[in-house]
Each structure stands twice: as structure tokens, then as C-alpha cells.
Amino acid sequence: DASALVTMTAGQGDAFEILPDRISKEPMAPAVRRADESLLAIVRWTIYAVIEAEEIGITAATINEPVPGRRAIADLFDLPAASALGLSNDWAYRTIKAVGNYGEIYDRNLAGPAMPRMQRGLNENWTRGGLMYAPPLR
């Protein structure tokens, strides 16, 4: 997996070159302990929320800024159905405010200045040729 290669060679400058060709795909996802359906739902919907935030251009820094032609961003992530998960209605808003959207999280942990050689590829939002998308949050 490319992320493992980037991690193993981090801090070694240009001693290694990671080629752009992909010879395999290894789908990965967050994991929770077996039979914890409640936590699985929380993790799944949290990921959907940060993916949706990236798709519509919301970042941790801009989440409180108005978007012309769209209702308040905070309202987009005011989700009454969250109570079924044991979460407050604003859980998605607070998550994005704290850690950012999917791209911000990805860049902070797998790319950006820390690992400049890691390309998002299929981890890019579907609007930019990747596979990442979220179902409707309502």
C-alpha cells in the first residue's frame, strides 16, 4: 500500500522514489470492535460528514462563514437524527470545526508537508476523480 511505503521512507529525503504506478488496490476503512453497531454508525456518519464538508468546500476555518445562495453552514450540519446515535444535533458541525473536512484530515496525516510524496488518488473526492462521496446526511 502506498501509504505504508510513504510512511516507511519518511525522513529519508530522496533516498527512495515511490513510483506512481499502482499494481494493487487495498480498500481500507475504519474498524470498530465486533458487535458495537452504535460506534460503527457513529464512525461511519462522522466520515460521511467530513467527506460532505470537503465536497461543498467547508473547512475548519470557514465553517462559520456564510455561503451565498445556501442556508447557513451550521444548519447544514444540524442533524436531529443524530439523537438516534446518542449524539447532539451539532455533532457534525463540531467535528468539522475541530478537525476539518476529509481533505484537511488526509493532508494533515498522510500528505502535505509531512509526506509530500503521498498523492490522494482514489482517496480524492468524487468531484475530482476519486471514489470518496457521502450519502445524503438527512
Where are these regions (language model features)?
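Terminal (typically C-terminal) long, contiguous, charged/leucine-rich segments with helical propensity
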Residues: G100-R108, A114-N123
